[in-house]
Amino acid sequence: PPLKLYAQGAVLMDATSGRVLYSKNGEEQLPMASTTKIMTLLVALENSNPEDVVTVSKTAVSEEGSSAYLKPGARITMRDLCYGLMLNSGNDAAVAIAEHISETTDDFAEFMNDTAKRTGILNTHFVNPNGLHDDNHFTTASDLARLTRYALQNDTFREIVSSGMYTSTMLMPDGTIQNVEYINHNRLLKELDGCIGVKTGFTKTAGRCLVSAVNRNGAE
């Protein structure tokens, strides 16, 4: 029977060869919601050390939408921020990462766009690190597949997106330690055999978005 897809755009790619096996509106520019964070994580891993300690700003904490439960003035490692970014889809974590690497989210977005060009992601434009809606923030299903194929070559990226759960540690301004448990929002990790996970996303404008990778008998 013909494939019934409700998604506006979809692509199935062989990760080894990069060959597109199936495409529905694969080159159509669409909003991407939190799948943006695939690029945020990639830029973070390529331009910082996992053991870097980040002091969380009030700006990061005040970011709307899904949260990694950061607190202003708390100190947290870049590694823990990356898990909060991908498992809890923390918009606050995205801003904290951006400010650590580039001082402002605008400068970080330019970093994201430069990385996109360098990796052959040519029909995508980033305005922010978390995917909150902006008419000038868009991608294509094909670009997300290419980006994820590239990012999964990074072992730390692969380790983070395939984790079901992670406990982060924050040093609070008063000297106390606060642990936060992150649970991966991607249900396919449990429900689909061989799923590596990658990133879910949702905004009212973008609808439900998903980028996922699967390994079956060594093929991805």
Feature names for model-found ranges:
Residues 1-5, 104-220:
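Penicillin-recognizing serine hydrolase domain
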Residues 1-35, 50-52, 109:
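Beta-lactamase-like hydrolase cores
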Residues 19, 38, 42, 46, ...:
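Solvent-exposed, polar/charged alpha-helical surfaces in well-ordered, non-transmembrane soluble domains
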Residues 22-43, 53-54, 76-84:
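Short active-site loop at a secondary-structure junction
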Residues 46-59, 156-163:
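Short, well-structured active-site flanking segments
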Residues 55-67, 134, 167-170:
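Acidic helix-start/capping segments at beta-turn-to-alpha-helix junctions
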Residues 64-95, 179-197:
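Conserved catalytic neighborhood of penicillin-recognizing serine enzymes
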